[in-house]
Amino acid sequence: MLETTNGEASPEDPPLNLKSLSQPPQKRSRTVEDFNRFCSFVLTYAGYIPTPATEERPWTPPSSVSPHRTEESDGWDSSPQLPVPSDPPQPPATSDISTIETFVMKAKSQGGGGNSIMKTGGPIGGSGEQVKKGSRRKRRQLHRGGVTMSDTDTDEEERDKRPAGSLPAPQLPPSAESSRDGGGSSSDTDTQVMDEDIMVESGDDSWDLVTCYCEKPFAGRPMIECNICCTWVHLSCAKIRKSNVPDVYYCQKCRGGRGSGGTALKEEP
């Protein structure tokens, strides 16, 4: 009994190799190189990247030999090796091509997803979503811009359809502005009235009349009358400003004879 317990194993205990074979195989973690190879294959398949001349065959899935097999073999060296069952049949390469085709179709349906991948040149996970969001924002802005343009067009059409009576009020004439400013004095208005009274139309007979001692015709220029001799003299010859026209005026001749007949001049109002 002791020999059987020490030297021989009981038939109930399964062998160690069967325990290790019953565990599911561990999946190999994907690396950045694998992802880059997958992206390059997808882009070449979609036609965004020209196929290099050196590559004769497209990218194929990794071979059946995986690193976890070597790790398992390293751990089995201590135990006696048993016949290893064959690996489960892997799906054909057509499944990978079908997934790539669906990926390309989705990218095209989303409005140039492949172009966004080309622009980013990095992983598809985060940057691709950001590019998609940016393209959506641009589309919204363009749509909003089109709406605003249509609104402006309608506003212009409404302005064209408005009647003439709805136009803004015309500007006031300069005379009203001058009256508002209040810069003009009452004397200026008086002189303007006097000038208008003195001015004569060109068709009148007095237009060519010569009365001033300058021997020049009236010609419509403002003149003043002497209170003694009743002679009309140009204001420019009498050196009188239009803004300061006196009520009583004496010409040069009357002023010269004022010394002898000064009493008569004083009697006149």
Swiss-Prot record:
Q: Kindly list the places in or outside the cell where this protein is found, as annotated in its UniProt entry.
A: Nucleus; Cytoplasm
Q: Where is the composition biased (Basic residues)?
A: 133-143
Tell me the segments the record calls region Disordered.
1-31, 52-193
Zinc-finger ranges (PHD-type): 209-257
What's any GO biological process attached to this entry? negative regulation of autophagosome assembly
List GO molecular-function terms, semicolon-separated.
zinc ion binding
Q: Which InterPro entries match?
A: Zinc_finger_PHD-type_CS (IPR019786), Znf_FYVE_PHD (IPR011011), Znf_PHD (IPR001965), Znf_PHD-finger (IPR019787), Znf_RING/FYVE/PHD (IPR013083)
Q: Where is this chain compositionally biased, Pro residues type?
A: 82-92
Query: What keyword terms does UniProt attach to this protein?
Result: Autophagy, Cytoplasm, Metal-binding, Nucleus, Zinc, Zinc-finger
Cellular component terms (Gene Ontology): cytoplasm; nucleus
Q: What does this protein do?
A: Acts as a negative regulator of autophagy.
> What note about domains is in the entry?
The PHD-type zinc-finger domain is required for negative regulation of autophagy.
Family recorded in the similarity comment = Belongs to the PHF23 family.
Q: What is this protein called?
A: PHD finger protein 23B
Q: Which organism is it from?
A: Xenopus laevis
Q: What is the lineage of its organism?
A: Eukaryota, Metazoa, Chordata, Craniata, Vertebrata
